Amino acid sequence: MIPLQHGLILAAILFALGLTGLLIRRNLLFMLISLEIMINAAALAFVVAGSVWGQADGQVMYILAISLAAAEASIGLALLLQLHRRRNTLNIDTVSEMRG
């Protein structure tokens, strides 16, 4: 069994990497990938905490996080396709120009 501190440190590192990618990148695809990393880091923290205390709640929250990530990915990819069709780019700065 993985100690609680090691699992939470790994989850924090993954969350920080995802947040860094989300803030630095301007490409919508990379931003979606970074957001997926952040969601998976939070789900990992739930699973680690649940396994330490012998509860199944962490695994239930993981299933909820995976379903949330699937919904987020489908909506994000639909927006990505529309942005690529209309502007022929994936730069997030052009989204503000799509109003209208």
From Swiss-Prot:
Major enzyme class: translocase
Listed InterPro entries: NADH_UbQ_OxRdtase_chain4L/K (IPR001133), NUOK/Mnh_C1-like (IPR039428)
Catalytic reaction(s) noted: a quinone + NADH + 5 H(+)(in) = a quinol + NAD(+) + 4 H(+)(out)
Pfam families found in the cross-reference section: Oxidored_q2
Signal peptide: none
GO cellular component, one term: plasma membrane
Membrane topology of the entry: Multi-pass membrane protein
Keywords: Cell inner membrane, Cell membrane, Membrane, NAD, Quinone, Translocase, Transmembrane, Transmembrane helix, Transport, Ubiquinone
Domain of life: Bacteria
First-listed, main subcellular location of the protein, grouped into a coarse class: membrane
Transmembrane segments: 4-24, 28-48, 60-80
GO BP annotations, alphabetical order: ATP synthesis coupled electron transport
Compartments (UniProt record): Cell inner membrane
EC number(s) on file: 7.1.1.-
GO molecular function, one term: NADH:ubiquinone reductase (non-electrogenic) activity
Annotated function: NDH-1 shuttles electrons from NADH, via FMN and iron-sulfur (Fe-S) centers, to quinones in the respiratory chain. The immediate electron acceptor for the enzyme in this species is believed to be ubiquinone. Couples the redox reaction to proton translocation (for every two electrons transferred, four hydrogen ions are translocated across the cytoplasmic membrane), and thus conserves the redox energy in a proton gradient.
Subunit structure: NDH-1 is composed of 13 different subunits. Subunits NuoA, H, J, K, L, M, N constitute the membrane sector of the complex.
Family statement: Belongs to the complex I subunit 4L family.
HAMAP family hit by this protein: NDH1_NuoK
Name this protein carries in UniProt: NADH-quinone oxidoreductase subunit K
Lineage per the UniProt record: Bacteria, Pseudomonadati, Pseudomonadota, Gammaproteobacteria, Enterobacterales
